[in-house]
Structure formats: C-alpha cells, structure tokens
C-alpha cells in the first residue's frame, strides 16, 4: 500500500500544479517542506505524511484551499513564490495520533470525496457501524487505505455480534433478563436508544462473541480494530449473576444523563477484560475498541487499558459554551475528570475522545461555534495523555459545521490557533473576511447569551433566545452573499439563517399554544423543497418532529423526543444551567 500512496502523492503533486522532490526521512515527526537551491523538497517519515505535504504545498503556495469534500477552491491570486533556500513549513509532531470522524450513515457517492478531503486535512481515522462497513466496497476500502485512513468496524454492536434472528430461539439465555424474563432481541429495528443488552456474565455468550469476532476478522482481513460496544441506551441484564455487578445504591450521574439507572461500568468492563484476553491469545494483532458513555463513562475500580485496547469516551450532551476543562461549567469538568481517569489507567492502551462538533443529530443544524475552543481543547487533550479525537458529522450539513471540522483537523495536528483561523476566513471570504468574522461572532454571542451553559438540543437554544437575534443574523448573511452571489457557501449561510428564523417562529408559536399540524406540515414542506444545499438533512427533521406531531395530537407537552427520562433531564437543565 505504501507504493500506492507514493504514486498517489506524485499524481496529486502534478494535479495541483506543484513541482517538488519527494523524499523519505525516518527521523522526522511529520512532513516538512524545504527549499534547496531553488528546488522544493517535501520530506516525510512515511508515504502518508508525504501525501499530506503535497496538499500542504498546494494550499501554501499553489492557490488552493481544501475546505469541504468534493469542492476544492482555487484562487490564482493566492499563488506565491517560495524562497531560494530554507524551511518553508517545518516538521511538527501532531498533537494527537488519531484524528477523524464517526460515520453514522451508509457509505455512498460522497465517500470518495470524503476520503479525499480527509487526506487533504491530515485526518486518518473513521469509526463506523458494522452494518455500514459491510456495505463498503473493496475499491473504497483501498481508497481509504492508500490515504492512510484506518476504518474501525464497530459502534453500538451487541446486536451485531449476537443477533436475535440467529440466537433468540436457540440461545435465549444470551439476552438480558428484565423483570424476571429474558428479552427477545428486536435486532436493532428500533435503533433509537435500543436499550436491549446481553447477559454479559454468561461464559458461553463470551466465548461465542470471541468466535464471531475471529470469524469476522478472517472474512475481513483488512480490519485491525474491532469493537465491542453495548447497544445504545440502557436495559442491562438483571439475572442473578449480572446483578452481582450492580450496587443498588450507586446510580449514574446528572452530567451524563444516567442518574435514573445503575452504573454499568463494572459489568461492562468485566466482559471487556475477558474478551480482550481471549482475543489477544488468538489474534494479538487486533485492537479491541470500546465506548465510555452515559452510565459507564469512567474506568471501574481495578480496570486497566492494556495493550490492544482502545476506549472512546463520548462527551454526550457536553456544554458547548465552555471548554472541556473549564471549572466554571456545570457539566464539562465531570467529563474532564473522566478523561483523566482513563489516561491514568493506560497500560499500553489508548484513549480517544468521541465528540459532537455538530451538536448531536437532533440539534438539527442549529449553531455550534467551536473555533478557538477547538485549539485549546486539543492542546489540553495532548497534555493529558489523550491519543485521538473523532467527531460525528454529515457532509449534507457541511456549511453549518464544516468550519468546526476544518479547525479540528488543524488543531489536532498542532497548527497555530490565530494563524489557522485567519487563514480559513481569508480563504473562504477574501476581502470580506472581517465582515464574515463579525457574522460568526454574532452567532457565537447568540449561544453565549442563552445562559451560563448551553447543551445542544433545540429547546435549550430556542427558549433562551430572541427572534430579533435570528433576523439580525439573516440580514448579515444576506449582506455577505450579496457581495459574492456565485459562492454556494455564502448562499448556504443565507439558507441556514432563514431556517433558524423559521424554526424559532415554529418554536415560539408552540410555546404560545398557536402551532397547528398544518403549520408543522408547512415547515417540513419548506425543509424538503429547498434546492441542493449543504445545510439541511430533511430526514432528521422528519424523525425529530414525529414527537411534536404526537404531542400536538395528544396535548402532551413537547420537550424533545418524547422519552420521559430524557425530558426529565431537560427540565432540570432549564433550572440549573443558568
């Protein structure tokens, strides 16, 4: 694969109009671009870093900017001459080893552009659901590999390793016992917070999981990271053996939305310890990946991250008005403590941060501005032993959150905060960069004005903001777009702010008890009828607003997604987040 990566680097060098010598130097921490007697040299410790260097040269001197997948920007006025001699871009060790995305949707026609963009921005990792990896073609697997992108086949997957369609009838004892009865697995048909787990203390179940893992990796020899993650939600087994791992007096925590359930860290980590040892005995080349999430956020007593183990700590519903280590925040310092607990038990294993730099799926393209905070957090992660960062994303909403993704990539490689932000604004907006900065400052101020803390779900934003703020943003976006009517990104900002105005109006009408189903239908029709854009994901609105429709019909108060336990936390957020 290294030969193919070198060949791709040479092809991309020519494609972007650059001339340079490519040389491998094992002692470098990353690529370095130099000039020697008028000749450009890209040196790097490996072919993937050489490829990164080719793209860095195209951006630095070739007039290119790689902001979004499939849409290279080229401005000949930004081409520059290089000095006769000296280092142009010095080698710099990336702050984090693993940098990438969590893909929660099938691979599709956008995937080649995504892999291309990731390489252009120095990202090297994708975590995806096993069911989506199963649909990834060999050609796309190679396209990822040649660009240095590792794909983890995993995510929530108890029901993949032990599917109900295979085991419900023959091994009902493999599934959780709830209320004295074994559940019948729905096989993930209800994918939202499935809350169907396994009887994880069953030794035959553990052996079967390992057998299935080994078989899977034999059928997919390219897979080197395989996951064992609970199904989303709760529903842990209550049989006699499993119940030994619960302390009925020890529930979860408010910050991680788990005060209403027992902690599952001990029972989950006992399973992981056993499966990792069995897997290591047969396939020591494999890494076992797993989640820290909701009611199993921190390592249980005595649990260690051994070599070949990798945890991804999900910062679910973190506050986006503060950095993760800000002691003044109500939520985030608890996650910071969890991070430190995980890095303190590393014994050859690795720690990743699972982020939501698009809020969460049902934040519905509402604003999250995490620019300067991104650089500060990546430095904090690096300083405290974190190995990787990944975020959920969608290409379809790139014009809303793409700047977060762009800054995450640069920050995780150790780029300078001020230089990076200035470069992105100048490349995206040219002479209008200062006006664009004012627009994004206004968006950021909208978030800060919501209160001391802000958790990314619609109610938290819309009930604590004013319509005039959204109308002002819309006017600012229109002014920016009027200066470059040919720029689809600026057009998307107009659409984005119009959408926010409409959503705010819908929310206010509901609060005033004036909203009807016809109004909701009109809003959804507007969402679906927009021309091609990278702002809105219509299917997310269809899913989210089923709850609102049900509540309009029943008279129940609409809070979020009609999950009683979740609505309860949101009502408490109303009171405690400031």
Residue positions per predicted region:
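Auxiliary, metal-adjacent structural segments of Zn-dependent hydrolase domains
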Residues: 17-27
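Short loop/turn motifs enriched for small/polar and acidic residues
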Residues: 25, 229-231, 291-293
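Substrate-binding groove of N-acetylhexosamine-processing glycoside hydrolases
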Residues: 2, 136, 142, 189-196, ...
């Amino acid at each position: 694969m290294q030969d193919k990566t070198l060949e791709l680097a040479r092809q991309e060098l020519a494609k972007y109009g650059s001339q340079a010598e490519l040389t491998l130097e094992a002692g470098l921490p990353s690529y370095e671009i130099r000039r020697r007697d008028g000749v450009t040299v890209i040196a790097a410790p490996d072919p993937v870093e050489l490829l990164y260097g080719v793209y860095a040269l195209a951006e630095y001197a070739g007039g290119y900017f790689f902001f979004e997948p499939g849409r290279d920007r080229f401005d000949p006025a930004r081409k520059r001459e290089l000095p006769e001699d000296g280092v142009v871009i010095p080698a710099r060790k990336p702050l984090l080893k693993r940098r990438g995305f969590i893909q929660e949707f099938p691979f599709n026609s956008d995937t080649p552009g995504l892999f291309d963009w990731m390489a252009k921005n120095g990202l090297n990792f994708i975590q995806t659901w096993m069911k989506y990896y199963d649909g990834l073609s060999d050609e796309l697997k190679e396209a990822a590999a040649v660009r240095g992108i590792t794909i983890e086949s995993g995510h929530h997957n108890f029901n993949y390793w032990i599917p109900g369609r295979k085991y419900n009838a023959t091994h009902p004892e493999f599934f959780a016992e709830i209320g004295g009865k074994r559940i019948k697995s729905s096989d993930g048909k209800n994918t939202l917070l499935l809350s169907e787990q396994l009887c994880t203390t069953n030794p035959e179940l553990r052996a079967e999981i390992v057998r299935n893992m080994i078989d899977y990796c034999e059928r997919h020899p390219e897979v080197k990271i395989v996951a064992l993650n609970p199904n989303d939600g709760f529903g842990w087994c209550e049989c006699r053996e499993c119940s030994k791992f619960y302390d009925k007096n020890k529930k979860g925590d408010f910050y991680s939305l788990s005060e209403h359930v027992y902690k599952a860290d001990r029972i989950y980590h006992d399973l992981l310890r056993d499966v990792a040892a069995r897997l290591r005995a047969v396939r020591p080349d494999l890494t076992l990946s797993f989640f820290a999430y909701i009611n199993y956020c921190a390592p249980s007593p005595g649990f260690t991250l051994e070599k070949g183990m990798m945890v991804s700590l999900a910062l679910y519903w973190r506050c986006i008005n503060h950095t993760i280590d800000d002691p003044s925040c109500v939520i985030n310092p608890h996650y910071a403590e969890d991070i430190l607990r995980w890095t303190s038990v590393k014994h050859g294993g690795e720690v990743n941060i699972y982020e939501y730099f698009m809020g969460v799926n049902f934040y519905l393209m509402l604003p999250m501005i995490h620019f300067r905070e991104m650089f500060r957090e990546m430095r904090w992660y690096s300083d405290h032993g974190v190995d990787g960062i990944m975020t959920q994303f969608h290409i379809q909403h790139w014009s809303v959150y793409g700047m977060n993704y762009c800054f995450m990539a640069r920050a995780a490689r150790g780029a300078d905060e001020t230089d990076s932000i200035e470069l992105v604004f100048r490349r995206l907006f040219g002479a209008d960069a200062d006006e664009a900065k004012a627009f994004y400052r206004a968006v950021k101020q909208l978030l800060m004005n919501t209160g001391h803390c802000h958790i990314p779900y619609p109610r938290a934003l819309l009930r604590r903001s004013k319509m005039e703020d959204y109308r002002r943003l819309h006017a600012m976006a229109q002014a920016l777009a009027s200066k470059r009517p040919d720029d689809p990104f600026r057009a998307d900002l107009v659409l984005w702010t119009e959408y926010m105005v409409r959503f705010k109006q819908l929310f206010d009408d509901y609060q005033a008890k004036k909203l009807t189903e016809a109004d909701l239908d009109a809003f959804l029709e507007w969402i679906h009828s927009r021309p091609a854009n990278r702002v809105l994901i219509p299917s997310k609105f269809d899913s989210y607003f089923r709850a609102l429709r049900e509540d309009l019909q029943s008279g129940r108060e609409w809070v979020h997604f009609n999950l009683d336990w979740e609505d309860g936390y949101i009502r408490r957020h109303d009171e405690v987040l400031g």
